[in-house]
Amino acid sequence: TNIYMVKVPYTAWAGNEASPVEVKDTYNFLDGLEQRYGVEELGTRERQLFSKLNSIGKNEEALFYQATDEMMGHQYANVQQRTHGTGRLIDKEVTHLSKEWDTKSKQSNKIKVFGMRDEYNTDTAGIIDYNSHAYGFAYLHEDETVKLGNSSGWYAGAVHNRFKFKDIGGSKENQTMLKLGIFKTMSPVTDHNGSLQWTISGEGYVSRNDMHRKYLVVDEIFNAKSDYTTYGVALKNELGYNIRTSERTSIRPYGSLKLEYGRFGSIKEKSGEMRLEVEGNDYYSVKPEVGIEFKYKQPMAVKTTFVTTLGLGYENELGRVGNVKNKARVAYTDADWFNIRGEKDDRKGNFKADLNIGVENQRFGVTFNAGYDTKGKNVRGGLGFRVIY
């Protein structure tokens, strides 16, 4: 008597639950998994992955479901959110150069080298928490007119941001972004002190990303790697009024609106096991913000000043940055796309606080900054060195 063992198709485990987003999502991934079965030669890492899956016993369905979930590329869920956040690092440093450091001449060039640590936490199922460490530089060229409060110029920045995901495998992503922009600041003719200022700016960016996705299958970590490009443009309007309360203190209430559009190209993992292909997608940001800044200056020595600024603000994302509906499929198969669950765009808004402490003179400065966002319980801190000439 001959006994034949027949492998049950992986699609038989798909179930009827809407997971991660729609009912067909798990089926489409498992269809790709089934198509990859037996493609790679014996002894390869992908064949070892299938051996791990096939070793799962009848009463160990939870292990199979966990392995399936691990392989489905949750790291690509909030690509747009991470890109948007990296761009804001440059924005923050350019703003510091523009507003926090007094210009002593009608034409100035300001450069700042900075490092920043960030953390993102969420309770949304399928979204992985992460830490990030960034370093880069910002440059600002400004030409002031004879009238106080009127100026124009351009700025540039570059940042390298390293993300470390808090998943089981310890996935990583590196992003390098370049940004270039122009701005113009105007003050009413009747405001001789230049206290009321309207600033309009436009910018564009491009970035290169390298993803190293690591995931657990039964009791072993497998991986896949990809690289991809993102790009975008933005327009910002800001209205602020500087109130000098004493020789050393000032208050600046402000309001702003920033519009941004960004997109990443299609992603196809080139190496590793159970490689995925992610469909290119975009995001748009519509972000109004209101806030107030408190500034204190204390002379320390000849031409040297201690400066501290506390900023309190409220912003609300009205665009589509988190719940972006990214899609993926198993690469090198003709399996259909499955959805990757995105972050909630809950419209709750974000209260933020930023503290900057620095020592500066007419040429050099050093600053320490720390901040907190209520949305995402985001804690950040950084250190910067700057020079003006």
Where does each model-flagged region fall?
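Extracellular/surface-exposed low-complexity segments
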Residues: 1-66
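Outer membrane beta-barrel translocator domains of Type V secretion systems
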Residues: 49-243, 367-380, 384
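Outer-membrane beta-barrel strand-turn architecture
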Residues: 103, 143-148, 186-192, 243-247, ...
